Regions:
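Hydrophobic membrane-insertion alpha-helices, especially the h-region
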Residues: 2-12
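Domain-level recognition of soluble alpha/beta enzyme cores
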Residues: 13-133
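Cap/lid segment of the alpha/beta-hydrolase catalytic domain
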Residues: 83, 91-158, 164-222
Length: 222
């Protein structure tokens, strides 16, 4: 009986925690923070991990940057609705899928998590240019898990370009609603450190091309 009450109490606390609003730590720099989310496609490179042949390599790119102060832009959601929507496992036993849904109901409701980034805000005119930091989450995590760090860097005058790679990141949800999962062939435990490093370098090179600068420049002229 005591055990049952203990479990019930724990579940109740988890449910209350799920329903409680949470705001990320306030950035410590002097700049306001803007954020844009983009779908970049490399027309010259095929994605060798895509389930079908002929798929061009895509990246989901998140850019945090120093934003102009005093504008009427909207504070963006910590996560867009389509990203935070629960995504059930694509396959597997029914029991596993049910447990995954139950676990999702007892973890924090991400719609109640709030950040400090303005959606597609104008770039701050205080400097002619800003240094760029390329951010890639470790293993197969999504880059939005590092939003607090990205916002803080942007508030200190850095452009932070983070990206998720389909079939390599755990789950990638593009703005148009497409969901791409990591493939079993890309389990990080199957690769050596050198192999993982070479893969990360190639992905970072794709992001480091002039397109990142061009994307931020667009916000200077909106």
């Amino acid at each position: 009986m005591v055990g049952v009450l203990g479990v019930a109490g724990l579940l109740g606390l988890l449910w209350l925690e799920r329903r409680t609003a949470l705001t990320l730590p306030t950035p410590t720099g002097s700049f306001a923070v803007g954020r844009g989310i983009y779908d970049w496609t490399d027309d010259k490179t095929m994605d060798t991990l895509a389930p079908g042949p002929g798929s061009k390599r895509e990246l989901l790119v998140w850019i945090w940057y120093p934003a102009a102060a005093g504008q009427s832009a909207t504070i963006d959601d910590y996560l867009p609705a389509q990203v935070r929507a629960p995504v059930l496992p694509a396959g597997g036993p029914l029991v596993f899928r049910v447990l995954s849904r139950v676990f999702g109901l007892l973890t924090r409701d991400l719609s109640k998590v709030h950040g400090h980034s303005f959606r597609d805000a104008d770039v701050s005119p205080q400097q002619r240019s800003y240094p760029v930091v390329i951010m890639r989450a470790g293993a197969s995590l999504e880059v939005w898990n590092y939003s607090t760090l990205a916002e803080d860097l942007a508030s200190h005058g850095y452009v932070v370009v983070g990206f998720d790679a389909p079939y390599r990141t755990g789950v990638v949800v593009f703005p148009d609603g497409r969901v791409m999962r990591r493939t079993p062939e890309n389990n990080p435990e199957l690769f050596s450190g050198e192999e993982l490093l070479s893969i990360r370098i190639l992905q970072a090179w794709q992001v480091a091309r002039p397109k990142a600068t061009m994307q931020v420049e667009e916000h200077k002229h909106d």
